[in-house]
Design a protein with these regions (language model features):
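Bacterial N-terminal signal peptides that target proteins for export
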Residues: 1-11
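Extracellular/secretory pathway-exposed regions associated with glycan biology
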Residues: 27-183, 719-742, 746
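Extended extracellular/luminal ectodomain segments enriched in beta-structured repeat modules
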Residues: 90-98, 142, 240-242, 753-760
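Short strand-turn-strand beta-turns centered on an Asx-Gly dipeptide
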Residues: 112-114, 265, 774-778
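Extracellular carbohydrate recognition and processing domains
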Residues: 123-133, 279-289, 772-793
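Short beta-strand-plus-loop segments that form exposed binding edges in beta-rich domains
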Residues: 148-157, 306-308, 797-805
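Edge beta-strands of jelly-roll/beta-sandwich modules across compartments, strongly enriched
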Residues: 155-164, 316-319, 804-813
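Non-catalytic accessory regions flanking glycosidase/transglycosidase catalytic cores in CAZymes
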Residues: 181-465, 470-603, 609-635, 639-642, ...
């Protein structure tokens, strides 16, 4: 969560003659992606699973298209499959688009204007082997078109990609018209996301049988070695209905809080299930139903007495492998099957988004993990694992479950690396995402049948170092500064390469320096081809460069690792966007009168703007993609009053959330992540629990993803002479002076191109050759540059090469 004041010449050696394409105008597939039906085999049959895929850009390995351990998604045994996807695209320009369908097996593509019945065949290629088929068609801007994609794969491995291009839009995979991510839930007791189908995965550790305040001996996986009680929840927001209880061993079960009754073979045993009832000696398992009639406001604690792990074990030896499968819905008499991993209510919510940020899932605000061996594992008795002196979220959840959730829902992942995590942890994290895991360690190569599969090949990985290390309300801010000081005092650190003595500056530099190192470690696993295409490191700062958190980090990264200050710090100079794909900040907005005396007054007062404009200009200046890690409309912050909670759920909150999302994109934002999935808070999209999803905020989100995103309206249109006043303060000092005093000092402008073409960029500096021109993060020329610019936003930066300094007052762009 955010700090609750939300309203607030060596370098020239890497010149290149062309620049990368900027993001084209808003367009793509709506509703969060393509809805796909997957069927085992190539001869038809029942759908094995359905998933909304963010994009069709697959490379399938032996693990198959599913990529998870839930029965429907366990596809490593498939020798082939059929896929049928349906989605609606909206172009932003009226022109001829060329659709491309690349495949390794039989593939077809059909199109129709939305609202009509007849399909037009664009591509139908039944041949096998790698091929790319193309078909051109005139499309009208703003008109929705339905696409249907058919694919049959006769082997375990294969590939499928759907893209398009036009005279003004470079070739690209068809992606979301309105990308919108969500900050996911936390796998801890009482979290109202209730992500797991098995409630025991989010329970506290087993405790004393007659006193849960007493710790007891547990085995290496967290199972009790004696009689015990499991604290299942301690607030009354869980579902009524039938829970399925199963475990290895025997025990007498007691519902200490009297919430319901235990049932076996149609017979009720009340709040106490006698030992041996429901026990199967052949499998050494006990099974029963727990029918919860009223959760009220009370806790749920289940006692296990007279325990025996095996028939030969002593009485009082504990149990293992407990599962308490939730009802399928509130009040339902049906429960999830024991092998189902996730609560369908949770995955249903996630299906509307294009990415999931796992900051809270990984317990980042208080996570002091250093080594791989300290992490939570999928085989642990619970994912809620408190550690003394860590934060309330404990260790966070297992990475294997994180990957499984992304694969089951078809969503990109945003992963945060804990503050203290060492290089080995990062390397193993990169391998787990690439190859999967055996439950303890990641594989080092692709596996035919991985225990826990790798991330599916169409999904992106956004990697961030920790979370809000600028925020003094979190302990990791001071801890990061202490790490920076220790590093400098140890000697040989680049953090004070220029003689800087401020501990605050060292700490700010350390954030981006560690992000750079994480980027290098991922590159070592994924290779150059995987970086920025699949793996996308991001650097997030305080709103609009508050406290110079963007300027300090980005300037340091290029001055030291890019030799931009004219000194040979490193043998191979790199631009910031070699290490980073994205940058940005939070994008929260709130009411202009959050403490008004009525809900109506709170919501009628208008709302603040997000800081996205300031974040976009910094991202564009360094060739990064703007990423809003948390945001949306909220009233009350971390501690809302009862009235403010009502305001967050009032009907008018729909318009407020819509305005927040629209302004994010209008101010140049690229990819916003809403905070957060569910909760009885100011932030919850589903609120108060995951079962209440028809909220005004959710209505706004559904509206946003059903159309193309608003086009930005703040950047300076070119060709034009752009004044110094429009440089937005993007330079190291944070002040606009017009004079670049030191080698490496810079100014930057964010400009907008309506029609792609050839442009000439220069300045009114007396000696233009004293300036390196940098476009979208890439140095392109000294003094003047002529080249092609695509439609959309571009960052143009000029960097001083002269020790005598360079003065200028205009950026001049002609066509």
């Amino acid at each position: 969560m955010l700090w609750n004041s939300r309203n607030i010449a060596l370098y020239a050696a890497v010149l290149c003659s062309t620049i990368p394409n900027s993001v084209a105008l808003a367009q793509g597939v709506i509703e969060g992606g393509f809805l796909g039906d997957y069927t085992e085999g190539t001869d038809g049959g029942a759908t094995a699973f359905q998933r909304r895929d963010t994009r069709i850009d697959f490379t399938w390995q032996e693990q198959g298209p599913g990529g998870a351990i839930s029965p429907a998604f366990r596809t490593a045994g498939w020798s082939g499959f059929s896929g049928l996807w349906y989605g609606t695209v909206i172009p932003s320009t009226s022109e001829t688009y060329t659709f491309t369908l690349s495949a390794t097996d039989s593939a077809a593509l059909y199109i129709r204007k939305t609202g009509t019945k007849a399909w037009t065949e664009l591509i139908d290629d039944p041949t096998t082997g790698s091929k790319t088929d193309r078909k051109a068609m005139a499309l009208v801007a703003g008109q929705p078109y339905d696409l249907s994609i058919h694919y049959t794969q006769h082997a375990k491995t294969g590939a499928l990609q759907l893209g398009w291009s036009s005279p003004t839009v470079p070739q690209q995979v068809i992606d979301a018209a309105t990308p919108l991510g969500i900050n996911g839930s936390t796998p801890v007791i009482n979290d109202q996301g209730t992500m797991f189908a098995d409630a025991a995965k989010e329970a506290r550790h087993f405790a004393g049988y007659s006193d849960t305040g007493v710790s007891i001996a547990l085995d290496a996986d967290g199972w009790p070695l004696s009689d015990a009680t499991l604290p299942l929840w301690n607030v009354g927001l869980e579902m009524t209905g039938t829970y399925g209880v199963s475990f290895v061993g025997q025990a007498k079960l007691t519902d200490w809080n009297g919430l319901g009754s235990f049932w076996v073979d149609g017979k009720s045993y009340g709040t106490v299930l006698p030992v041996g009832v429901g026990y199967d000696a052949a499998t050494n398992t006990t099974e029963a139903k727990w029918v919860v009639s009223a959760t009220g406001t009370t806790a749920a604690n289940i006692g296990f007495a007279t325990t025996r792990r095996t028939a030969a074990s002593a009485v009082g030896s504990g149990i293992t492998n407990l599962k308490i499968m939730r009802p399928l819905a509130p009040g339902s008499t049906s429960t999830y099957a024991t092998e189902v991993l996730f609560n369908a209510r949770y995955t249903s919510l996630l299906s509307h988004f294009t990415g999931i940020r796992f900051m809270d899932y990984l317990a980042i605000p208080g996570n002091k993990l250093q080594t791989w061996s300290e992490r939570a594992r999928p085989g642990d008795a619970t994912q809620d694992q408190l550690v003394s002196s860590w934060g309330w979220e404990g260790k966070g959840g297992a990475l294997e479950y994180l990957v499984a959730l992304a694969n089951e829902t078809g969503k990109d992942v945003w992963i945060n690396v804990p503050l203290y995590a060492d290089d080995d942890y990062v390397t193993r994290l990169a391998r787990l995402l690439a190859y999967g895991s055996d439950g303890t360690n990641p594989y080092t190569s692709r596996q035919a049948d991985p225990t826990y599969p790798a991330l599916n090949g169409n999904l992106k990985i956004y990697v961030e170092y920790s979370n809000e290390l600028w925020n003094p309300l979190y302990p990791q801010q001071a801890e990061n500064e202490a790490l920076a000081v220790a590093e400098v005092e140890a000697g040989g650190s680049p953090l004070n390469y220029d003689g800087e003595t401020s501990h605050t500056i060292w700490a700010q530099r350390r954030v981006v320096d560690r992000t750079r190192r994480i980027s290098d470690l991922f590159r070592a696993v994924w290779g150059d081809s995987g970086m920025m295409s699949r793996v996308r490191p991001v650097f997030e700062w305080q709103y609009a460069n508050a406290n110079n958190t963007a300027a300090v980090g980005l300037t340091y990264l290029e001055n030291y690792y890019g030799n931009a200050d004219g000194k040979p710090h490193v043998s191979t100079a790199r631009s910031a966007n070699y290490y980073l794909w994205g940058g940005g900040a939070g994008w929260y907005v709130t009411s202009n009168a959050p403490t008004a005396s009525s809900v109506a007054a709170i919501l009628a007062a208008g709302q603040t703007n997000p800081s996205t404009e300031g974040d976009t200009i910094w991202a564009e200046a360094f060739g990064l993609h703007e990423m809003g890690y948390e945001g949306g409309f909220e009233v009350g912050g971390d501690t809302p009053s009862a009235l403010q909670l009502l305001a967050n759920r009032a009907a008018a909150a729909e318009d407020a959330e819509t305005n927040a999302i629209d302004r994010f994109f209008q101010l140049g934002g690229g990819y916003p992540f809403v905070f957060n999935a569910a909760g009885n808070t100011a932030y919850g999209i589903a609120s108060p629990t995951i079962n209440e999803q028809s909220t005004p905020k959710m209505a706004a989100i559904l509206k946003a993803i059903s159309a193309t995103r608003p086009v930005q309206d703040f950047a300076f249109p070119i060709p034009a002479t752009v004044p110094l006043s429009f440089d937005m303060g993007v330079h190291p000092s944070g002040k606009t002076t017009g004079t670049l005093t030191h080698i490496g000092d810079y100014l930057a402008w964010t400009v907008s191109v309506a029609t792609p073409g050839t442009f000439t960029v220069t300045t009114n500096a007396a000696t233009p050759s004293n300036l390196t021109i940098i476009i979208d993060g890439k140095p392109v020329a000294k003094g003047s540059w002529t080249g092609a610019l695509t439609a959309g936003l571009h960052g143009i930066r000029v960097r001083n090469l002269s020790a005598a300094g360079t003065a200028l007052s205009q950026l001049i762009v002609t066509q």
